[in-house]
């Protein structure tokens, strides 16, 4: 691997948005480099694995990427630092090196929001998307009793994956009200593909106005306590998968000076956040793969100067932004979910920091100094979203190294010319 590399266009993330961006930009002849920490393109939604059923659309996009001679892809690669303007230090399993670029598109996606509740650290409790990823990677669930709880369509998708591999779904607990879910369903004919998909994912164990209260068990999960439409019930289960929506992955954007709006990267009509720096997909807000694909294509066209091609995609983007708005309104989290944790409920699993140790602090910095919350191995990737939701604390921009790195990789910084 060369100690340095140059890209006319550097794309971070090879999910739907990153793939669409690369393919939109490729006809320009620009030298395009894609980085992703997964082995194959597709992101979380099209994650590959021994038990994965990758959609035809994803396979076609992979084939088109493979056919483009001006797209170079680095799999299993992480961004470590930004040592200078338009320059990143990156690392894979074999080496670390510097990449300089002219234009950058961030397609860093989103991660699950996990809210703490009693028992959530028991073995057998995972994220809803996490369970789906584990099953695709080969986790056997044949005959296991599964409860899925939280909010949003990901619950149904996770349940469908589990059922396909032999799990027994005991309950799908959706915290949104029946009125909100029915109102969302009534709008789905505006997006026929989503309307048909909703029929294929429907499950008779689905309940609205239902949320988790506690995971039950001693050494591992044995059951779950739910508040179901005003009543408290308990179900025996072998697995509990919870997901309370998605949080945009904005940390790298923050470090590179991108504008932030709410919890997402802020972009203009061309998907630009600052000069020569673009973003697309769920790092700019959750809206599904269709919105990510069109945003990625707009960013790709705009980054290589084909503004007319980008402009022609604006109506399609607006259509899927309408879907995203309806989705986010229908599945907005009930404020009572903020009170699930008890004083002794762990919030930061890495540093064993309970909820009671965080109440009374005014911001992240104060809480870290007092408790080390968010300073463990995951660097706040799990507890950070929960703390922001529970207390409203805004995370500060990450400091390098952004991911754990080898000493040899950090030594590449010696090759950085002085600013």
Please provide the spans of the model-predicted regions.
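A conserved FAD-binding loop/helix module that cradles the flavin
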Residues: 280-315
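Residue-level detector of alpha-helix initiation sites
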Residues: 15-16, 40, 112, 152-154, ...
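FAD-site-proximal beta/loop scaffold in flavoenzymes
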Residues: 127-135, 239-287
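A Rossmann-like FAD-binding core segment of flavoenzymes
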Residues: 65-90, 99, 165-251, 259-261
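Local cysteine-cluster metal-coordination motifs and their immediate loop/turn environment
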Residues: 344-358, 371-389
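Beta1-alpha1 glycine-rich phosphate/pyrophosphate-binding loop at the start
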Residues: 2-3, 7-64, 143, 148-149, ...
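Active-site-proximal substrate-binding core of FAD-dependent oxidoreductases
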Residues: 270-273, 301-340
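FAD-binding core/adjacent interface of flavoenzyme oxidoreductases
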Residues: 2-9, 47, 58-145, 223-230, ...
């Amino acid at each position: 691997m060369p100690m340095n590399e140059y890209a006319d266009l550097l794309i971070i993330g090879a999910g739907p948005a990153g793939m669409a961006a690369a393919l939109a930009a490729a006809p320009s002849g620009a030298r395009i480099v894609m980085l992703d920490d997964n082995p194959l393109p597709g992101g979380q939604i099209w994650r590959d694995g021994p038990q994965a059923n990758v959609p035809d659309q994803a396979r076609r996009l992979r084939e088109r990427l493979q056919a483009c001679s001006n797209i170079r892809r680095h799999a299993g690669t992480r961004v470590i630092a930004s040592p200078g303007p338009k320059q990143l230090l990156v690392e894979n399993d074999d080496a670390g090196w510097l990449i300089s670029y002219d234009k950058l598109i961030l397609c860093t996606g989103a991660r699950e929001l996990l809210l703490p509740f009693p028992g959530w650290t028991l073995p057998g409790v995972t994220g809803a998307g996490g369970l789906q990823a584990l099953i695709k990677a080969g986790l056997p669930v044949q005959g296991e009793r599964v409860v899925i709880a939280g909010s949003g369509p990901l619950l149904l998708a996770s349940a469908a994956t589990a059922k396909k591999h032999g799990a027994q779904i005991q309950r799908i607990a959706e915290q949104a009200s029946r009125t909100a879910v029915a109102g969302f369903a009534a709008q789905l004919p505006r997006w026929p593909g989503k309307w048909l998909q909703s029929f294929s994912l429907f499950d008779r164990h689905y309940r609205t106005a239902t949320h988790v209260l506690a995971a039950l068990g001693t050494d591992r999960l044995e059951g779950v306590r739910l508040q179901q439409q005003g009543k408290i019930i308990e179900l025996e289960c072998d697995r509990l998968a919870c997901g309370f929506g998605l949080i945009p992955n904005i940390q790298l954007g923050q470090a590179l000076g991108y504008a932030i709006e709410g919890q997402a990267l802020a972009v203009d009509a061309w998907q630009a956040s600052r000069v020569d720096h673009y973003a697309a997909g769920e790092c700019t807000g959750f809206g599904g793969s269709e919105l990510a694909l069109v945003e990625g294509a707009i960013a790709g066209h705009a980054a290589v100067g084909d503004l007319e091609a980008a402009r022609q995609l604006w109506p399609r983007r607006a259509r899927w932004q309408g879907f995203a708005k309806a989705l986010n309104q229908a599945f907005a989290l009930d404020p009572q979910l903020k009170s699930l944790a008890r004083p002794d409920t762990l919030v930061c699993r890495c540093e064993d920091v309970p909820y009671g140790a965080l109440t009374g602090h005014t911001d992240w910095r104060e809480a870290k100094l007092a408790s080390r919350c968010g300073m463990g191995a995951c660097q706040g990737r799990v507890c950070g979203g929960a703390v922001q939701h529970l207390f409203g604390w805004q995370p500060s921009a990450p400091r390098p190294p952004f991911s754990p790195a080898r000493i040899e990789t950090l030594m590449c910084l010696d090759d950085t010319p002085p600013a």
